[in-house]
């Protein structure tokens, strides 16, 4: 009983990180969002590790893990991109439903939305599909499609990258509808296509593939040092690029 509690407790901490991230995302405090998501991703790794070490793997824990991940790695990046759409200057529409509903419910129903910004929640839908597929497949050294935590890190780090001093002149090109829509749709595709990506766990069976994993880690360090926390977006791009090279290498 105690053994099962430890990994499940770590999973719930991941969920709490996701909930706090949502609150900060709505306040445009993207640095706090990224830190909390990083903590959630770490806890997501630790709960699985703890379950294996304690021999406490269970179907309950597996389902709880997915439910936590859909918040931290699905809902949070969707909200962050929704906020980016709003920051890009999209038109906000006001809806007044008082004339229709007020006589019945006596409520003040006036709200404002940016319709195009709702495209951001395709990320949440794509993440849900990805996590459902993940529950039916046992991954070892490789993934099929971009893992939801990696996808989440890309998007929650994006606001910080866009505001970085090195990219200030490119901000208008990064923070616009065309870029955000392209990134959103691309992420949904990348999460759900059968494209092989390596995990960062070193393999004792495929020594030649370890070089790509080591390269990912080593090259990530100067990127983070140069771009700060926003560099995590570039690290995910690096990860995808090295996977393309690795897959082409395997064909030779």
Model feature map: region roles:
Residues 1-2, 26-32, 57, 104-115, ...:
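Short juxtamembrane and helix-loop transition motifs at transmembrane-helix boundaries
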């Amino acid at each position: 009983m105690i053994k099962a509690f430890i990994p499940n407790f770590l999973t719930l901490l991941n969920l709490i990180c996701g909930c706090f991230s949502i609150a900060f995302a709505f306040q445009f405090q993207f640095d706090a969002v990224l830190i909390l998501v990083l903590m959630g991703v770490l806890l997501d790794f630790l709960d699985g590790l703890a379950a294996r070490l304690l021999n406490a793997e269970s179907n309950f824990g597996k389902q709880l893990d997915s439910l936590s991940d859909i918040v931290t790695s699905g809902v949070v990046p969707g909200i962050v991109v929704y906020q980016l759409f709003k920051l890009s200057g999209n038109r906000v529409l006001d809806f007044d439903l008082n004339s229709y509903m007020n006589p019945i419910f006596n409520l003040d129903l006036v709200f404002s939305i940016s319709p195009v910004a709702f495209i951001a929640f395709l990320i949440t839908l794509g993440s849900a599909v990805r996590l459902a597929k993940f529950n039916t497949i046992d991954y070892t050294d490789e993934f099929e499609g971009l893992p939801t935590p990696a996808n989440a890190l890309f998007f929650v780090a994006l606001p910080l990258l866009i505001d970085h001093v090195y990219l200030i002149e490119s901000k208008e090109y990064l923070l616009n509808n065309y870029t955000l829509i392209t990134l959103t749709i691309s992420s949904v595709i990348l999460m759900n296509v059968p494209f092989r990506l390596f995990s960062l766990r070193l393999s004792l069976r495929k020594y030649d593939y370890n070089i790509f994993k080591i390269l990912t880690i080593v090259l990530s360090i100067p990127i983070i040092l140069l771009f700060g926390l926003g560099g995590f977006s570039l690290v995910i791009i690096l990860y995808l690029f090295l996977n393309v090279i690795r897959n082409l290498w395997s064909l030779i």
